[in-house]
């Protein structure tokens, strides 16, 4: 059996929310954030469907894997150049202190919440030779553990890997890998798992849940359950940027938050194409608190992405095609088989506090996500996108009932794009 190594990254996110949001501080060029927006913008035209991804996590994986390379190896030089070109990261040998501190701060932020679990597991399969000091002692900010597993059938190896992941994550990660995820020709494998279930600052009012149409375009629609929330929220309407936005704060102790964005008139692709770290910061900083009614479809997105197929199209192929990573003390370097990211994201009613009861008759601001919209879950301190995604087609539940009357569906809203 060929040499096999698996690195499994699990980030189970049951995000919690903040109270009052502090306006962001002026930021210089943030390459971590810029890469997140760039990769998302490049992927959307290829998918053109409901999607969710964590570009931030993919970047962190490859930045940390650079610690397993030999600076004297020509393959490392090519790998470093591609890291700089594609991931906007300039490797300088050891993980720079600034990057190390940033990853450590983010790792500590994840650990603040009981519902958050992040685990990275490096697994050697079918090999008894001693692993390198570098593999076993990657920077703590990377959060990577190392394990060795015996070779066996795909079923046995999958079961062993899943058991190891479950054990290290304290039961949070279960049955992440399937037999089809393992390729016997791989030497090195990365699995990146994210689970997010929004636990909001304010609970959506379940008694006002309605079944209404979600419009993919002017002709195509489908039924979805829409959640209802009326509360003082940060909101913005910016025709100059073709965007309407609202912030759904997570639990008050969370360092993260969520912003929903819809185009004002043009198609969502034009909105996505216009986004960058600078533009998102402009949008976020210009939002203001106002009484706001939000109608958001209740949905769950699950997605599997191959980093290899995505990144090779962007010119990042050395890691997969050449022997770059040194994981054994007496053996040469080996390539990476793939980095598979699995996302499981749910938007549901659960929240920390009940929304306030308003006695005034003013309608306030309205944000009804009845047509293609995008969402970003981000670090409030630096506005770094952690998870980015979009809903462009109805996700109709199997047990959905008949459409609610027009009044409950806002008489009803219609698609306003092109």
From Swiss-Prot:
Extra remark beyond the main annotation: Binds to heparin; binding to heparin does not affect the interaction with host coagulation factor Xa (F10). Instead, heparin may function as an anchor that targets FXa-directed anticoagulant to endothelial cells. Binds to phosphatidylcholine and phosphatidylethanolamine but not to phosphatidylserine. Heparin-binding site is also required for phospholipid binding.
Species the sequence originates in: Aedes albopictus (Asian tiger mosquito)
Entry's family note: Belongs to the serpin family.
Signal sequence extent: 1-19
Known partners and oligomeric status: Interacts with host coagulation factor X/F10 (activated).
Pfam families: Serpin (PF00079)
Source domain of life: Eukaryota
Gene Ontology CC annotations of this record: extracellular space
GO biological process: immune system process
Record-level Gene Ontology MF annotations: heparin binding; lipid binding; serine-type endopeptidase inhibitor activity; toxin activity
Protein name stated in the entry: FXa-directed anticoagulant
Tissue and organ expression note: Female salivary gland (at protein level).
Gene3D superfamilies on file: Alpha-1-antitrypsin, domain 1, Antithrombin, subunit I, domain 2
Stored InterPro entries: Serpin_dom, Serpin_fam, Serpin_sf, Serpin_sf_1, Serpin_sf_2
Intracellular or extracellular location(s): Secreted
Stated role: Anticoagulant and antithrombotic serpin-type protein inhibiting host coagulation factor Xa (F10). Does not inhibit host uPA/urokinase-type plasminogen activator (PLAU), kallikrein, granzyme B (GZMB), matriptase, elastase, alpha-chymotrypsin, chymase, coagulation factor XIIa (F12), coagulation factor XIa (F11), plasmin (PLG), thrombin (F2), trypsin and cathepsin G (CTSG). Inhibits factor Xa-induced production of pro-inflammatory cytokines, such as MCP-1/CCL2, TNF-alpha/TNF, IL-1beta/IL1B, IL6, IL8/CXCL8 and IL18, in human endothelial cells.
Residues bearing attached sugar chains per UniProt: 117, 167, 286
Record's keyword terms, sorted: Blood coagulation cascade inhibiting toxin, Glycoprotein, Hemostasis impairing toxin, Heparin-binding, Immunity, Lipid-binding, Protease inhibitor, Secreted, Serine protease inhibitor, Signal, Toxin
